[in-house]
Amino acid sequence: MRRRFEVCALMGVFALVMSCTGAIATPRDGAPVVGEWNGLHASLTLTESGGSIEYDCAHGGLRAPVEPDNAGQFTVAGVHFRDHGGPVRIGEVPDSMPAQYVGKVQGDQLTLRVIVGAETLGPFTLKRGAGSRLLKCL
């Protein structure tokens, strides 16, 4: 009888730990990820309608919300702008290119790659609420 109680109690604790771990490890399927995500060489701001990103010598925008699947993975179309040193000239048209923002969310960590044509930027490891460390073009 005592053995049966111990096994049941252990199974209950295991189920509780597994359910909490899953809730922390990845967001709910389809729920938009929002907030400030920062790290070395990148700063990402996500909203319920899309987002913006700033890199050392570039910036960009996400045209849709980040809605990870059950595994925490996502792909969002957007735009990428190459920056340059010095001021922006009057009438200057930014150098924009289509981009795919591909990543994975695990708890308070987001890993991001940005695909621009044949070039892949990253991976960037970003943490929710952390400070960013950007080295802007001069």
Segments and roles (model prediction):
Residues L44, R63-E67, E92, M97-V105, ...:
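Hydrophobic/aromatic beta-strand elements that line small-molecule binding cavities or substrate pockets
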Residues M1-R3:
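N-terminal secretory signal peptides that target proteins for export/translocation
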Residues P27-S43, R133-L135:
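Tryptophan-anchored aromatic micro-motifs
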Residues V76-V102:
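An anionic, turn-rich surface loop/hairpin at beta-sheet edges
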Residues L40-R82:
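N-terminal glycine/threonine-rich, aromatic-flanked beta-hairpin/loop signature
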Residues A31, N38, T47, G60, ...:
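Residues that act as N-cap/strand-start positions at coil-to-secondary-structure junctions
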Residues C20-A25, G60-Q73, Q109-L138:
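Edge beta-strand at a domain terminus
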Residues C8-S19:
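Bacterial N-terminal signal peptides
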